[in-house]
From Swiss-Prot:
Protein name according to UniProt: FAD-linked oxidoreductase iacH
Biotechnology and industry use: Iso-A82775C is a precursor for the biosynthesis of the anticancer natural products chloropestolides A to E via a Diesls-Alder reaction with maldoxin. In the absence of the prenyltransferase iacE, siccayne accumulates instead of iso-A82775C and can also be condensed with maldoxin to produce chloropestolides H to K, which show also antibacterial and anticancer properties.
InterPro entries attached to this UniProt entry: BBE, FAD-bd_PCMH, FAD-bd_PCMH-like_sf, FAD-bd_PCMH_sub2, FAD-linked_Oxidoreductase, Oxid_FAD_bind_N
Cofactor entry: FAD
Glycoprotein is among the record's keywords: yes
Family: Belongs to the oxygen-dependent FAD-linked oxidoreductase family.
Induction: Expression is co-regulated with the other genes from the iso-A82775C biosynthesis cluster and probably controlled by the cluster-specific transcription factors iacI and iacK.
Segment forming the signal sequence: 1-22
Amino acid sequence: MVSLKACVVAYGFTLLPALVSGSPLVPRYFQKHLVSRCNISAITVQSELGPQLSNTSLIFGPDNVLFPNATERWNTLDTPDVQLVVQPAAESDISKIVKYCNDNSIEFLVRNRGHGTTTSLSAFSGIEINVELLQGITIQPDGETAIFQAGTYGAEVINTLWDQGYVTTTGSTACVGLTGPSLGGGHSRYEGLYGLVMDNIVHYNIVLANGTEIGVNETSHPDLMWALKGAGHNFAIVTSLEKKIYPGENWHQHTYTWTQDKLETVFEALNTFHKSYNGTTPPKMGVNYGAIIMNTSYSTTEAVMEWGFQYAGPGDEAEALLAPFNAIGAIAEDQFDASYPTIAGTTSETCGSAKRAISSAMTLDYNITTERALYDHFVAKVAEYPDLAATAYLWHEGYSTEGYQIIPEDSTAYPHREENHLMVFFTEVPEDSDLLEPALDWAKEAMDLWNGGQPDRLPSTYVNYAQGADYETLESVYGYESWRLERLRSLKAEYDPENRFRYFVPIISDEA
């Protein structure tokens, strides 16, 4: 239950943005009960809100056996304070939940798969709207699009479509949701052919902060359509969306393990490869994922480079493109053809919940000198903190980019179309250890090295990988062109003047 003190603090912080944006002195959702309704139990919400919702909707608190799974987070470092969970069984329930929260001065936060990691989530205390029951997938009669409800996620989407002969853009890991990543862009194995996840969405059904249900597309609220594609967490709850689907095909994967003496050769080959198709990556070579990682099967003191290339087509086509990498002597390698669901499941080993220290960067190319420095730094840290070593990664995501870079940069709120690569450091921090600060320092130092390798460019932060650290700026996340944040804030004042959506990398924070 939310304490009265917490309610007073929340009231003060939430009211200030309303005053700044020119809203009435007391927002509507504070007028009826002010702070007293923050002290509210599951039984009370069940009796008051329950009759308004679909029969199979659920309302429960921390004493319910469903609560741990419903509130689990992929990263437990900074977690929201969930007092109660409401699981709507129908899209129409969501607007009723939002209106109830507004009328009773209760904050709300939407959760599907729980993969958001930013520190701003820890500012939340209130009701979680858990959309996991909304899992409908409907392929449209023309076979060009499908409608996905808010609770769908990667593996479910991929497998359902595959069984009908289709694929679509989803996040790179099968355990993450579909809608959440799309609000920040959504990098995908198919982006070289079809663009980001968000680039394929043609219609959103949403609930605004005041509980109003509207449809958003290129002709209905096109300004909000622009904002939802790249900064959508700040504006609405997506109850379902319609997005493009495509004919499915089998994929080819080739993985390599190289020792550190091949590092310069590998990154030289990668830089050449990513410009080998008219200045970009071959579109069907969807992605190469690479990690500098400890693998004690080979060495307990030196990290190795594990790299996997995934190609949307047959092996002979892929292997012709991979000839430069086949020429680099690997200590282990494997290749196979497989269905797309099998390929999509190859990055699921990190899906479990844990306390993680994370940082990220975006670059145009791989700075080879920097990668050597990162390797040496990694090995030194492994020696210093062996309890962090087993789960530490220097992760490289090299997508094919043609499909999303041909889309005009100003057509969506996503600001990073010129970036070619995503880099991430993460490690798991053992519970009840004193290794959190060293892990966070390691993360920042790795990010600083990546950014230092492109000194003539400003740092860029992919919003879905943002951590909310003080060294991340809103400009690095939402774009350095001044018009971008100006437009977002103008739309925020129009669609969410009371700043109800402020818990995931907010463009206007509690302190604003």
